[in-house]
Amino acid sequence: MDRPDCDPLLLSRTYARFPVVNRLLSGWRRTYKRRIRPLLAETGHASLLDIGSGSGDVARSLARWARQDGFTLDVTAVDPDQRAYAFATHLPGDKRVTYRLAHSSELVAEGLAFDVVISNHILHHLDARQFAAVLHDSELLCTRLALHNDLQRSNVAYILFLAGFWPLGWGSYIVRDGLLSIRRSYTMAELRSAIPPAWTVESNGPWHNMLVHQHQGSGNRNRA
């Protein structure tokens, strides 16, 4: 689905089915409760940047969970792919979610800052230069916490994903792209050897690794 010439109908169905996959596998509800909600509880409000937001389902879920808990989470969801941006912006809107067609580096250039910076399932799509750039941008953009959630490569994950999600594969890229993503993804040891000292790697459930950066210091950037 990264290919510019992929079938638009299959791609649209893939975006539409991402919420099912993320709800079952990605662990963002757990991460929200453990990582993001405690920050919200301090002031009642926070800003969050979702890098490579795709269909926008994670961004919308986080804003909704915060609202249900009585907090305000203003989410900026950025993706450089026009197709993802078009899909997300044609869905029913959420006043707390803003979509932008942009790279993270553009937000750095604008001097923006967010309490929390996240991504979901993008690291395995990046080459070494892009990987380093996203982590660097995240350090510059976050004022409190950065969390990058990605698949953990394993034979068990590959087999179980194929067995459990094949119904979603019909008419979409879900299974094909999911299996390729697992093959491209990192083990925990590989991530530890690839990240700079300001980052740590944690297990996020049985199928994911999470890169974590706790911001130190302060600056005079433009709060988003």
Predicted segments — roles?
Residues 49, 55-57, 62-106:
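Class I SAM-dependent methyltransferase SAM/SAH-binding core
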Residues 143-151:
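Conserved beta-strand signature within the Rossmann-like core of class I S-adenosyl-L-methionine
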